[in-house]
C-alpha cells in the first residue's frame, strides 16, 4: 500500500506544478490578449471613421 501512497503524492505534486505553470502561461496570454484587443479596437475606430466620411455609404 505504501507504493500507492508515494505514487499518489507524486501525482499530486506533478499536478500542482502543472497548475502553477499553466497559471503563468495564462497571465502571459492575457497580456497578449489585451494587446490584441487594443489592436481590434483601433481597427474598429478606423472603420467608424470611414463610415463617417461616407466611404462605405
Curated annotation (Swiss-Prot):
Biased composition (Acidic residues): 20-29, 45-57
Cellular localization per UniProt: Secreted
Keyword hit for Ligase: no
GO cellular component: extracellular region
Tissues expressed in: Expressed by the venom gland.
Region (Disordered) location: 20-57
Family: Belongs to the non-disulfide-bridged peptide (NDBP) superfamily.
Name of protein: Peptide BmKa1
Organismal lineage: Eukaryota, Metazoa, Ecdysozoa, Arthropoda, Chelicerata
Amino acid at each position: 500500500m505504501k507504493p500507492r501512497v508515494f505514487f499518489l503524492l507524486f501525482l499530486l505534486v506533478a499536478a500542482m506544478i502543472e497548475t502553477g505553470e499553466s497559471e503563468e502561461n495564462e497571465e502571459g496570454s492575457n497580456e497578449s490578449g489585451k494587446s490584441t484587443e487594443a489592436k481590434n479596437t483601433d481597427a474598429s475606430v478606423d472603420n467608424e471613421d470611414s463610415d463617417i466620411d461616407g466611404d462605405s455609404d
